[in-house]
């Protein structure tokens, strides 16, 4: 029962909502109908408005056509009237000049009408120049006089209006028709140039000139009717005036004081600075002529650049010569003539006769002098890049390279090596040979590395792929190879002298030294070996200071091998008893210890085998066979082992000796 009541209530609610829905739908349909009707009416009104706009546009076009036509008609009527009026005014004012009376028209007497008066006078002047001179000479003179007065007044007005660009522009426009316009421009440009004052090393004035052009270009464009002409005039005055005066004075001062270094340096600096300034001026579009700025630059520098190459080479020759002369004077050394086959022959003969001069161990190589010469040539290469044209540059660089090779290679390094070679005796010396040639090699090598660095930059980038590249490279390589060849020859001779002196020291050993009768003697390194060891240690120390890397290893290996061969031969000159063999072991051990410090493995193996061979002389007779077959003697010739065993005084008593 209750369920049916609820269903009934819901049915009533449903009916109520349905009635509301029906009412709202009816209302919506009515409003939709009204909206459509309004939209239709608005569409019709819009169409009418468009039609009216088209009619109005057509009417405006028709009216504008009539107005333009009417304007043309009025203009065609007005122009003749205007010209007639102007002609009438000119005739009236011309009459004033024809009469002998003073000019009374307000246009001539009112200072405020100067511009109108100037325009009128210019026209009258132009007309008067077309008249017959005999008939109108007086009026021409009078108009010309007035023309000059007005022209002067315009220039004065222009100068007086410096702070009023608008007024200056008005005056300049009128004045541009007068003959004195160029004079006005000149005065204005001169006025601007007065703000430039020489200062510093010359570079500051270039910066001032550039800044002046940058700041004045907008002002000139606003004032003058032809600003490009005025800017060209300004730049022309700058170049031919203050700039040229300052640069010329600066370079003349260097010439007057004979300061060639500062002359070349300032020339390169000022020229390169001027080129940089010209690049900045090109951004301002000063002139339509692309050669305008370069022509002005040439007008200042051409006479200096024309002689630059010869002056650069003269300066380099003088400077390098003076550097070397001062160095040799500081060493109190008078250079000897070197070079050529005759000199080498004399040098070798003197060396063989032991008539050598060591100059107290002086190397005659100065790294500071070499650096100074390299710096001078480096500066010269930089100046050449700035001052030489592309066609002339490679040849000039080759000439600078020739100067560098002449003095640094020929007059300094080659001379030092030749002098060092002359100080090495080719005979077996009885006095301790000096070790300074290693220092010569060390210093020369350092300078060569600096030279190679300069060749890589800046020389090679300049000459690369030019006509002089092959010849410069050939000269450079020949010079360095010649120097390296002489240094190698000197090192070879130095090793010979070292081994020769060691031979001399050991030559004082006697046969009895290794066959002492007494067993009660000190077992120690022989005095001769001690002297040789100290001597070799000093030589190798100098060698290590003078050489490094593979060169040092090769030298030490060669020296160790030569000493090994000498000792091998020297040992076989004597016979040994057991005590003498122990003494010999001390000598060989001393030299082996010295060689072991050189870190040359191949040579050390030789000395270990030599010590093993020497040990054959010291062991007991019944141990000789065993010692002869030790691992240290595996690679030693069996005959050599046999020869060593025969050096024992008790060789014949050894039983069952087999190799």
Swiss-Prot record:
Keywords: Coiled coil, Exocytosis, Protein transport, Transport
TM annotation in the entry: none
GO CC term, one of those recorded: exocyst
Coiled-coil region list: 1-58
A Pfam match: Sec10_HB
InterPro entries: Sec10-like, Sec10_HB, Sec10_N
Gene Ontology BP term (one): exocytosis
Family membership: Belongs to the SEC10 family.
Functional note: Component of the exocyst complex involved in the docking of exocytic vesicles with fusion sites on the plasma membrane.
Subunit structure: The exocyst complex is composed of sec-3/exoc1, sec-5/exoc2, sec-6/exoc3, sec-8/exoc4, sec-10/exoc5, sec-15/exoc6, exo-70/exoc7 and exo-84/exoc8.
Name of this chain's protein: Exocyst complex component 5
Species per Swiss-Prot/TrEMBL record: Caenorhabditis elegans
Origin organism lineage: Eukaryota, Metazoa, Ecdysozoa, Nematoda, Chromadorea
Gene: sec-10
């Amino acid at each position: 029962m209750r369920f049916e009541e609820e269903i009934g209530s819901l049915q009533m609610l449903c009916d109520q909502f349905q009635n509301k829905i029906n009412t709202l739908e009816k209302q919506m349909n009515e409003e939709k109908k009204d909206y459509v009707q309004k939209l239709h009416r608005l569409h019709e009104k819009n169409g009418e408005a468009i039609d009216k706009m088209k009619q109005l546009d057509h009417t405006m076009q028709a009216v504008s056509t009539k107005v333009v036509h009417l304007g043309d008609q009025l203009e065609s009527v007005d122009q003749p009237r205007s010209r007639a009026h102007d002609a009438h005014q000119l005739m009236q004012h011309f009459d004033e000049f024809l009469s002998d009376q003073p000019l009374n028209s307000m246009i001539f007497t009112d200072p405020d009408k100067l511009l109108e008066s100037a325009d009128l006078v210019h026209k009258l002047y132009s007309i008067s120049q077309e008249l017959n001179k005999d008939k109108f000479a007086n009026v021409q003179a009078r108009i010309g006089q007035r023309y000059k007065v007005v022209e002067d007044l315009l220039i004065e007005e222009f100068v007086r209006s410096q702070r009023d660009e608008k007024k200056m522009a008005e005056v300049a426009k009128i004045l541009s028709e007068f003959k004195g316009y160029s004079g006005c421009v000149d005065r204005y440009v001169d006025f601007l140039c007065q703000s430039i004052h020489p200062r510093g090393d010359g570079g500051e004035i270039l910066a001032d000139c550039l800044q002046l052009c940058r700041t004045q270009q907008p002002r000139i464009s606003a004032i003058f009717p032809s600003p490009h002409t005025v800017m060209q005039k300004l730049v022309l005055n700058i170049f031919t005036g203050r700039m040229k005066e300052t640069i010329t004075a600066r370079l003349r001062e260097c010439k007057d004081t004979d300061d060639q270094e500062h002359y070349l340096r300032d020339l390169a600096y000022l020229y390169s600075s001027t080129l940089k300034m010209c690049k900045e001026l090109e951004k301002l579009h000063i002139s339509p002529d692309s050669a305008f700025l370069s022509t002005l630059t040439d007008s200042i520098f051409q006479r200096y650049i024309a002689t630059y190459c010869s002056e650069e080479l003269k300066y380099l020759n003088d400077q390098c010569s003076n550097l070397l002369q001062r160095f040799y004077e500081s060493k109190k050394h008078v250079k000897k003539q070197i070079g050529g086959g005759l000199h080498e022959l004399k040098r070798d003969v003197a060396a063989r006769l032991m008539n050598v001069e060591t100059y107290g161990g002086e190397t005659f190589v100065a790294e500071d002098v070499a650096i100074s010469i390299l710096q001078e040539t480096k500066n010269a290469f930089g100046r050449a890049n700035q001052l030489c044209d592309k066609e002339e540059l490679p040849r000039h660089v080759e000439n600078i390279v020739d100067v560098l090779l002449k003095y640094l290679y020929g007059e300094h390094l080659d001379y030092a090596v030749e002098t060092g070679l002359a100080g090495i005796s080719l005979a077996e010396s009885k006095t301790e040979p000096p070790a300074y040639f290693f220092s010569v090699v060390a210093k020369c090598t350092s300078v060569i590395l600096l030279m190679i660095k300069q060749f890589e930059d800046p020389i090679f980038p300049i000459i690369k792929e030019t006509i002089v590249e092959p010849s410069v490279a050939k000269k450079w390589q020949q010079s360095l190879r010649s120097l390296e060849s002489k240094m190698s020859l000197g090192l070879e001779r130095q090793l010979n002298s070292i081994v020769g002196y060691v031979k001399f020291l050991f030559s004082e050993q006697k046969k009895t030294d290794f066959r002492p009768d007494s067993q009660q003697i000190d077992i120690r390194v022989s005095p001769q070996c001690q002297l040789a060891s100290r001597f070799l240690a000093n030589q190798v120390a100098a060698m290590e200071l003078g050489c490094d890397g593979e060169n040092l290893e090769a030298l030490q290996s060669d020296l160790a091998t030569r000493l090994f061969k000498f000792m091998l031969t020297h040992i076989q000159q004597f016979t040994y008893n057991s005590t003498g063999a122990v003494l010999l072991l001390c000598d060989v051990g001393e030299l082996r210890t010295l060689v072991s410090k050189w870190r040359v493995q191949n040579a050390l193996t030789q000395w270990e085998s030599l010590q093993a061979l020497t040990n054959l002389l010291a062991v007991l007779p019944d141990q000789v066979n065993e010692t002869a077959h030790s691992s240290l003697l595996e690679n030693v010739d069996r005959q050599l082992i046999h020869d060593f065993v025969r050096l024992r005084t008790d060789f014949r008593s050894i039983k069952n000796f087999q190799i």
